[in-house]
Amino acid sequence: MNGRRWAVVAATVLVAGVAVTAALAASSRHSAGKTFYFIPKDTLNPYEVIADTGGKRALTELGDTQVVSSGTEDTAAAQQPAIQAAIQAHAAGIVIAGNDPQAVCPALQQAQAQGTKVIAFDSDVNCRQLFINQADTATIGRSQIQLLGKLMNYKGQFAILSAASTATNQNAWIKYMKLELKKSTYKNMKLVKIYYGNDNPAQSRQATVSMLQAYPNLKGIESPTTVGISSAAQYLSHSKYKGKIVLTGLGLPSQMKTYVHNGTVKEFQLWNPDDLGYLAGYAIAAMADGKITGKVGDTFEAGKLGHYVVIRGPDGRPQVVLGPPYTFTIKNVDKFTF
């Protein structure tokens, strides 16, 4: 074979190789231009707003569009119009924070039947393909009681100020709080009652007043909801109970730093909700692309957060865990802006 023919063959092989490489690269890339609906518990909760913003950041990086839609109340009924809007728009995916694990399922299953992918984040639902968990559920619940116990010197009565009575994440955390309380370490601590503020500031403040009136010997309040803990802190900071009642839970540094500095709250915990939404954004995009299906062992890349693996959750269903909770104190709370 002469030199010219060798050159033609070599060029042909090179072009073919480039084509194969390009095809493989294209198959691994995200197909941009999709629309995804983020349906928070409600649109007024600052925590949910931050999480949704993280989701928008992820989808913008991927060249997609985010629509945030929900009601202004923490109920499943208030989320139904948003789900129907996603169905009508033939959205590529829905990311929802459940107010009720089952009530939204008929509508979500209708969405799935037409090809819309469904992921839950922050608070789980029964009919999703994947759950983006802010931290290991058991770790959150147990660490809340561990922190409360330390702050109460492991003795006295305390109450829990939760969100909605049907909130999946709240109930799961409280389950593990109760399990942690069975340890001998907490034999001198007593949970007197669980109150529900429905993630409404006014209702949460009233619940705080009610528990203090009902239990004059109350020593602590545990609130695993950002609305609950900030509302309770606001009331306590202007009352005779400031510095006398231990208040801890899950809070936003931006809302809680004032109460940490004025002595109302010593320590509280959370994770970065912006990162939670960001992770959910990458996960729903990967699912819409067919890169993951929600099967245990699936892997995907989540932008700045790196590599994630789908694992089996405590209930046996697939989930992705953002990371461990973080404890905020007067020494570090000013370092955070979310």
What are these model-predicted stretches?
Residues A10-A19:
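Bacterial N-terminal signal peptides
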